[in-house]
Each structure stands twice: as structure tokens, then as C-alpha cells.
Regions:
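Acidic/His-rich structured neighborhood in mature extracellular/periplasmic domains
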Residues: 1-75, 155
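A cross-kingdom marker for long, charged
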Residues: 52-168
């Protein structure tokens, strides 16, 4: 659209009509998901993972790329590199780090995630949200808990009981 010409490409996807329902669920989720109890990267990842999991439940016919406002190619990149991204978070000891720069690198809207590696420009922004979503999905698949229990559980409980193990 001509009004969006000055916006960066990574933001333009949010202006698509297909994003209307996911945006409504995002707004709703802020009212039902308690904010993280700490400022660690893992807590923020899980918080947004819960939001995206709500989209799984409330918008089951939408594809993952629409739910997270990625392109199909970005979803494929996430799937293909999930193990690599996870190893990076673990090896760099970022999960329990509360450095205020981490959300800007891995959670906040951006053209790409900032690992400080050659893959940066290939990676989608907000990769931490996507990984958090996979952790929440694993938790729900491997535990008999209600949605209410999920929403009230803290990040450590979810992570510790998720049995999350990405493919290498």
C-alpha cells in the first residue's frame, strides 16, 4: 500500500489484513497472561510463547507464519535452525540472563535477530518469541495441565517440565 512505503519491510507484514485476528488475540492475551515475574530472557520467551500458544487454540486454522507475523520462509528458517539457535542460547548462558539488551536482540520487533554471527541477516527478528512458543508447545504436549494452569505457571516451571529438546 502506498501509505506504507516508508515503513521497513519487517514491519509491513503487520499491516496485512491477515494480521487482524492475531492482533486481537495478542491484545486479549495481555489481559489474561500474567507478566513475567523476572526479567530473564527465558521468562520473556515463555511469556510470548504463551501468547502464541493462545493463538494456536483460538486461531487453529491460521498457519504459524500468520500467527507470529513471519513469512513462510522465516518459519522454515526457524525450523531448520532451531537446534542451532537453542545451542547458542545455552552456550552463551542467555536463558537466565537479565541483561536489558537481550530483548532488543531476540524478542522485540527487528529485521533480524542479533546473535553477533554471520547468520544474523538470515534470521528473522523475534526468534526468542518463536523458541518460547516451541517450549510452551512441548510443555502442553508433555503435561496434563489446563490452559489456566499454563497461564499461571512461571517460566521455570514450564521450561523444567517441557522436555523441550530441539532437533540438532
Amino acid at each position: 500500500h502506498r501509505f506504507y512505503v516508508d515503513f521497513p519491510n519487517y514491519q509491513k507484514i503487520n499491516f496485512e489484513k491477515a494480521q487482524l485476528l492475531p492482533d486481537v488475540v495478542s491484545d486479549f492475551s495481555m489481559r489474561v497472561i500474567p507478566p513475567p515475574t523476572d526479567r530473564t530472557l527465558l521468562s520473556q520467551m515463555i511469556y510470548f510463547g504463551k501468547e502464541l500458544y493462545l493463538k494456536d487454540l483460538l486461531l487453529p486454522k491460521l498457519s504459524d507464519d500468520v500467527k507470529i507475523a513471519y513469512t513462510p520462509e522465516q518459519i522454515e528458517w526457524c525450523k531448520d535452525n532451531e537446534g542451532y539457535v537453542w545451542r547458542y542460547f545455552v552456550d552463551e548462558k542467555l536463558l537466565y540472563d537479565s541483561d536489558s539488551k537481550l530483548p532488543g536482540r531476540f524478542i522485540n520487533p527487528a529485521p533480524f535477530s542479533k546473535f553477533g554471527l554471520e547468520i544474523d541477516n538470515e534470521s528473522p527478528g523475534r526468534i526468542g518469541m518463536w523458541v518460547g512458543w516451541q517450549i510452551v508447545r512441548a510443555y502442553m504436549q508433555n503435561n496434563d495441565v489446563s490452559l489456566q494452569q499454563l497461564l499461571q505457571a512461571d517460566a521455570k516451571e514450564i521450561f523444567d517440565n517441557s522436555k523441550y529438546k530441539p532437533k540438532k
